[in-house]
């Protein structure tokens, strides 16, 4: 029996339930409470906010836990790669006495004091918090202020966040740019961008459940970035099915010839810094296209 793809994509494009939104709000509130209860962290300039699909309202039920960023605003790590000769001194930054390592350890203590030792697991990049009594399922990311300088001026930078995994290295992220660009894309496509993101995410999850291995390496955020890349005119079809097919077709045909970026338009979508590659994406897109045509 063939699938009614128009009705299926209409259903899959809908936002997650109000329960899912409440889940994100509750997680944010409980993480803030944990920080406010910490004698050390409560005195510091810290921002707590959701990021990723829950904030963007593109999450689907099968997405991972709520992603909560805990950012220490007074600690800064800068990327000067675009401005040869730029350094901390020219940026008017001083060596901090309170380090990222101390911050992450203090956050771990605060979370365990709030949710219990068994409710908090320390990962390489984030804390996995599962506390049934508080109804919290969240990935809590300890971050500091990240800056990307574009000119030799202490105020000439793009602000983001930065994390330092336990395994080493530095990762810059751009949550505000992700959010604002996603909002603008949704407006420019007549509110169709987020609909199609959710539809294709659920298509990916459906394929994974059916045993298609090509769907499994494709995370939620990558799907969102891919749909963002598609030009606005490909969202103007007269049906959900047409718009989904337009996006898949465009991405498959253009992926080899393009240096694409994430939604933030700062970080390259492909490269050694990412956990995915173009071959995996092409295989997924081909699987998705073939599945729609054959069913």
Curated annotation (Swiss-Prot):
Q: Does the keyword Metal-binding apply?
A: yes
* Entry remark concerning the domains of this protein: The (R/Q)xW motif controls pyrimidine nucleotide specificity in the donor pocket, while conserved Asn-173 is important for recognition of uracil in the acceptor pocket.
The source's domain of life comes to Bacteria
Residues noted as binding Mg(2+) 3 in the record, renumbered to the chain: 65, 128, 139
What this protein is called in its record is Cyclic dipyrimidine nucleotide synthase CdnE
Q: Which gene encodes it?
A: cdnE02
Q: Which organism is it from?
A: Legionella pneumophila
UniProt-listed Enzyme Commission number(s): 2.7.7.-
> What family is this?
Belongs to the CD-NTase family. E02 subfamily.
Its cofactor is: Mg(2+)
Q: Motif Pyrimidine specificity motif (R/Q)xW in donor pocket: which ranges?
A: 274-276
- Keyword Metal-binding annotated: yes
The entry's keywords: Antiviral defense, Magnesium, Metal-binding, Nucleotide metabolism, Nucleotide-binding, Nucleotidyltransferase, Transferase
